[in-house]
UniProtKB/Swiss-Prot annotation:
Disulfide bonds: none annotated. Part of the 30S ribosomal subunit. Interacts with proteins S7 and S18. Binds to IF-3. Belongs to the universal ribosomal protein uS11 family. Located on the platform of the 30S subunit, it bridges several disparate RNA helices of the 16S rRNA. Forms part of the Shine-Dalgarno cleft in the 70S ribosome. InterPro entries: Ribosomal_uS11, Ribosomal_uS11_bac-type, Ribosomal_uS11_CS, Ribosomal_uS11_sf. PROSITE patterns: RIBOSOMAL_S11. GO terms for cellular component: ribonucleoprotein complex; ribosome. GO terms for biological process: translation. This is Small ribosomal subunit protein uS11. It comes from the Bacteria. GO terms for molecular function: rRNA binding; structural constituent of ribosome. Keywords: Ribonucleoprotein, Ribosomal protein, RNA-binding, rRNA-binding. It comes from Frankia alni (strain DSM 45986 / CECT 9034 / ACN14a). The lineage of its organism: Bacteria, Bacillati, Actinomycetota, Actinomycetes, Frankiales.
Amino acid sequence: MPPKTRAAGAKKVRRKEKKNVAHGHAHIKSTFNNTIVSITDPTGNVISWASAGHVGFKGSRKSTPFAAQMAAENAARKAQEHGMRKVDVFVKGPGSGRETAIRSLQAAGLEVGAIQDVTPTPHNGCRPPKRRRV
């Protein structure tokens, strides 16, 4: 019988290492249902992230511009703890929280450099969902 290494239920805790990154990228994915803000270093390693659901909004309130603002502020605050000062913004998706998230990154104290729209557009790929009839 192999010897037990850890007590039952004990988890191995991984410490967060303090990275010191002055310049990075902010990726804002804004869908119709949620907004996700990820702040990475220039190579793409995630330093901090937040989403409207992670900040505490549920259901249809996740898709509001205010929820996107709160998520961007939360991610910016965490990134500033790692020494982040300047970001280039990449926005993806058709959601309502795009502009609000960019403004709140600036308001949180991050200097916004370039803003780029990287929304994927199909070259007539999959059939889109049917139109809503209300």
